[in-house]
């Protein structure tokens, strides 16, 4: 039976993050968001992900892609 749903895939990289919505039927891209990976720099110069900012960006991208998808989103993959 054909799978007429969509999946959202989250790719968190050290430079950029991509959140993409694909058709599960034929892997067609239904939408995508790309943004710079948020980072924090400590006074000592250590660099780490800014988890709160990153989470807000990912949540916003998921919400926008879900709302715009012509297919119901039933899966999220990281």
Label the model's feature ranges:
Residues 1-78:
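N-terminal glycine/serine-rich phosphate-binding loop of ATP-dependent small-molecule kinases
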């Amino acid at each position: 039976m054909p799978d007429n749903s969509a999946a959202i895939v989250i790719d968190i990289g050290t430079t950029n993050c991509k959140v993409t919505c694909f058709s599960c039927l034929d892997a067609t891209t239904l939408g995508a968001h790309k943004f710079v990976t948020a980072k924090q720099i400590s006074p000592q110069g250590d660099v780490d992900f800014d988890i709160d900012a990153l989470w807000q960006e990912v949540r916003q991208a998921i919400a926008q892609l879900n709302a715009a998808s012509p297919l119901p989103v039933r899966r999220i993959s990281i």
